[in-house]
């Protein structure tokens, strides 16, 4: 199956798992924004430290602007396979198309590790 248009690079499974772990810890001890509207606002305000997007979002127009916005604001971003898992990691009973990490809480080291790998993903 072809990747959606908003998926600009492949995120290794290990890194996707770390991103989900980061979302979970940040939702419990830090501050996150869930959903495309909230992610867009926190990215435009340059509050987001990292954006995590699901690859199985339909319609794709929901997320198509997020990677461009992140690059403009120099915010690292990664992808995870399933929106249901992203929602669960954010502490929701429903799925989430995207999550912005605003304050990582106890996951600061994990955030820094993921953000450091971002430049190599885009090649």
Residue ranges and their predicted role:
Residues 13-20, 60-68:
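Short charge-dense sequence patches
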Residues 1-47, 105-123:
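Polybasic, low-complexity intrinsically disordered tails and interdomain linkers
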Residues 63-64, 68-122:
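Short basic, glycine-rich beta-strand/loop surfaces that mediate nucleic-acid
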Residues 35, 51, 70:
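Residue-level signature of catalytic and energy-coupling elements of molecular machines
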Residues 43, 47-63, 67, 76-80:
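Extracellular/luminal Protease-associated
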Residues 4-10, 54, 77-84:
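Short, functional N-terminal and low-complexity linear motifs
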